[in-house]
């Protein structure tokens, strides 16, 4: 049995739909008119959306204000749209025309992002009823949630990315930052060895102490082994084994 607590009913503004409106109101099922649904923002998502229209259905082809796309956005993942279109005999058309309308409805649902789309045409008093059922994919998230929610992993990745944002030194630096960035405190031990004092090492990228694999091409520490900040580093100037 369907849980109507998770169902929204959209009704076109015509007389037959007014009877349905009263019926669903007695069942305490939320209902909204087509014009109101298109005009206002829906803040809740539903497992099921019923869309009823009698006689008038041209609004379903409106590309500038696509109601099916908006329905898709207010459905939960794997939520179901049930579209019910009544066409009276006085509206004209034959079975071929009705089939064309059903096919177009399926295409519009597909273009709006629905899957598992099916349709059924039934005879009714003084007309026919076209039923189209479509499902909202579970791999799509609601548009409103995309702006407000993210997984813990995504938040962690964003935080890590922010840590990597650094203020680089300009090639033609005139403020003195470049000079400070390449400054190394050195103490000569002998003619073959120099000791580098890294406690006050300055770097624009912050990766210099990790080793050459992480250093930029102009790194002042290029060629030095990896070191810990504050560690005294000795470099063999002749590149001979110690």
Curated annotation (Swiss-Prot):
GO molecular function, one term: 4 iron, 4 sulfur cluster binding
Subcellular location: Cytoplasm; Mitochondrion intermembrane space
Motif (Cx2C motif 2): 216-219
UniProt keyword Mitochondrion, yes or no: yes
Single GO BP term: iron-sulfur cluster assembly
Region listing for Linker, in residue ranges: 141-162
Region (Disordered): 140-159
UniProt-annotated stretches for the region N-terminal SAM-like domain: 1-140
UniProt function note: Component of the cytosolic iron-sulfur (Fe-S) protein assembly (CIA) machinery. Required for the maturation of extramitochondrial Fe-S proteins. Part of an electron transfer chain functioning in an early step of cytosolic Fe-S biogenesis, facilitating the de novo assembly of a [4Fe-4S] cluster on the cytosolic Fe-S scaffold complex. Electrons are transferred from NADPH via a FAD- and FMN-containing diflavin oxidoreductase.
Subunit and interaction comment: Monomer.
Protein name: Anamorsin homolog
Lineage, top ranks: Eukaryota, Sar, Alveolata, Apicomplexa, Aconoidasida
């Amino acid at each position: 049995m369907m849980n109507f607590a998770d169902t929204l009913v959209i009704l076109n503004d015509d007389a037959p739909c007014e009877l349905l409106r009263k019926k669903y109101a007695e069942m305490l099922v939320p209902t909204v008119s087509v014009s109101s649904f298109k005009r206002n923002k829906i803040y809740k998502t539903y497992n099921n959306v019923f869309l009823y229209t009698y006689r008038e259905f041209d609004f379903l082809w409106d590309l500038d204000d696509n109601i099916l796309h908006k329905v898709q956005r207010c459905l939960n993942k794997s939520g179901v749209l049930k579209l019910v279109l009544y066409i009276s005999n006085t509206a004209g058309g034959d079975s071929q025309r009705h089939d064309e309308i059903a096919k177009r409805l399926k295409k519009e649902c597909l273009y709006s992002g629905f899957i598992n789309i099916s349709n059924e045409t039934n005879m009714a008093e003084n007309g026919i009823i076209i039923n189209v059922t479509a499902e909202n994919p579970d791999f799509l998230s609601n548009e409103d949630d995309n702006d407000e929610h993210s997984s813990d992993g995504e938040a962690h990745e964003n935080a890590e990315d922010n840590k990597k944002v650094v203020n680089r030194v300009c090639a033609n630096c005139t403020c003195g930052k470049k000079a400070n960035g390449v400054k190394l405190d050195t103490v000569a031990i002998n003619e073959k060895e120099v000791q580098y004092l890294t406690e006050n090492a300055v770097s624009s990228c912050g990766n210099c102490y990790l080793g050459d694999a992480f250093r930029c091409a102009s790194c002042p520490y290029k060629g030095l082994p990896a070191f810990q900040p504050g560690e005294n580093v000795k470099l063999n100037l002749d590149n001979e084994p110690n």
